């Protein structure tokens, strides 16, 4: 596992960071480039869709 690899915990931590930045409001991942890139990278590495990776970031439940 490299420094820039995205795992479940790191993806959830990045989503939480965006959630705090929005004062616990609605998080649009496209407005946060670090979160958007992490979701795309996670989806590519794990063979799931962008939406499934976003659900994992939000809830912690794997849908794939």
Question: Where would I find each of the regions flagged by the language model?
Answer:
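Acidic, low-complexity, intrinsically disordered interaction modules
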Residues: 6, 12-64
């Amino acid at each position: 596992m490299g420094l820039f690899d995205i795992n479940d915990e790191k993806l959830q931590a990045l989503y939480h960071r965006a959630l705090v930045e929005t004062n616990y409001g609605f998080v649009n991942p496209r407005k946060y480039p670090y979160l958007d890139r992490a979701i795309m990278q996670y989806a590519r590495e794990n063979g799931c869709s962008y939406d499934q990776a976003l659900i994992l970031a939000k809830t912690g439940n794997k849908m794939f």
